[in-house]
């Protein structure tokens, strides 16, 4: 029940506007690396010193105007340049709705290609985040178009979707770099597993499918059972460490992140920054409602 409440709140535009004005003091600092690229760089440097790599994400989705989409696109280019300038072990992640997908596919494609051009210039990899199901087909279509132009481009497949395995198979000709996740949006039972067990079993089958195809696989999870499954799979099939990595979110299980890195696994931390943090934060609380305590602490400190 709480999960559905927080997912509903994540889509509330009034609350998003209020939270943006109030700042990350509402407990979000645990999960967000600050408002600026400078704060994100500082965070990633600290992670790199601990043996962790990163993917930087400028928070924002559902751009309501070309001006907003243009601003996010420019910030993405700025982030790429910062990654190169500071020699960070980091990639860039972005959401297509943040660069205008809801306004027009042409606008989003134009911005994405411009961002990828800068990324290619600085040799920085980029991952297109997957959003809710209403944007699923467009995201895969745009990924297919741009993957052929930019080799170091990845995208995300959500394990809670019934169709995920078929979509991975359809992409094999692209040799896709995929981040596999459980999925964090509220979706209908018509398209997504409604229960954790179904999602987890499907997640394991997707990891196996992607890894055994020989394509790069990022297993994005905080679940020890999924981590254990992946470790056993790569050991059994002698899959090289260069073909996969684990990913976790900034602020969640930081000690486990360090443990995996010390064990010799490539461990990437998803590092978001920016003022448009509310929707992201609500989805993190929906995944683990106990995190709501940090909201209360943030308010009580005022």
Swiss-Prot record:
Swiss-Prot/TrEMBL keywords: FAD, Flavoprotein, Nucleotide-binding, Oxidoreductase, Proline metabolism
Binding residues for substrate: 95, 283-284
Cofactor(s) required, per the database record: FAD
Positions of FAD binding: 130, 158, 182-184, 221-222
Temperature dependence of activity: Optimum temperature is 25 degrees Celsius. Loses 70% of activity upon activation at 45 degrees Celsius for 15 minutes.
InterPro entries: FAD-linked_oxidoreductase-like (IPR029041), PRODH_bac_arc (IPR008219), Proline_DH_dom (IPR002872), Proline_oxidase (IPR015659)
Membrane-spanning segments: none
Family indicated by similarity: Belongs to the proline oxidase family.
Name under which the protein is recorded: Proline dehydrogenase 1
């Amino acid at each position: 029940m709480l999960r559905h409440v927080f997912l509903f709140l994540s889509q509330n535009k009034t609350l998003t506007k209020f939270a943006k004005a109030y700042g990350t003091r509402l407990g979000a600092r645990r999960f967000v690396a600050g408002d600026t690229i400078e704060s994100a760089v500082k965070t990633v440097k600290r992670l790199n010193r601990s043996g962790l790599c990163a993917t930087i994400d400028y928070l924002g989705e559902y751009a309501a105007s070309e001006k907003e989409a243009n601003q996010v696109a420019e910030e993405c280019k700025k982030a790429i340049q910062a990654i190169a300038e500071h020699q960070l072990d980091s990639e860039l992640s972005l959401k297509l709705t943040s660069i205008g997908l809801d306004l027009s596919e042409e606008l989003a494609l134009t911005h994405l290609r411009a961002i990828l051009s800068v990324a290619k210039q600085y040799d920085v990899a980029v991952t297109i985040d997957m959003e809710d199901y209403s944007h699923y087909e467009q995201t895969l279509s745009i990924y297919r178009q741009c993957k052929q132009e930019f080799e170091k481009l990845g995208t995300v497949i959500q394990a809670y979707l019934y169709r995920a395995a078929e979509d991975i198979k359809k992409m094999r000709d692209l040799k896709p770099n995929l981040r596999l996740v459980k999925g964090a949006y509220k979706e209908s039972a018509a398209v997504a597993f409604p229960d954790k067990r179904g999602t987890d079993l499907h997640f394991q089958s997707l990891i196996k499918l992607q890894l055994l195809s020989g394509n790069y696989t990022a297993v994005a999870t905080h679940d020890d059972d999924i981590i254990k499954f992946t470790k056993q799979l790569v050991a059994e099939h002698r899959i090289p460490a260069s073909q996969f990595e684990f990913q976790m979110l900034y602020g969640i299980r930081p000690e486990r992140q360090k443990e995996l890195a010390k064990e010799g696994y490539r461990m990437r931390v998803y590092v978001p920054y920016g003022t448009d943090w509310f929707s992201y934060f609500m989805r993190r609380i929906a995944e683990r409602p106990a995190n709501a305590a940090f909201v209360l602490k943030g308010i009580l400190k005022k």
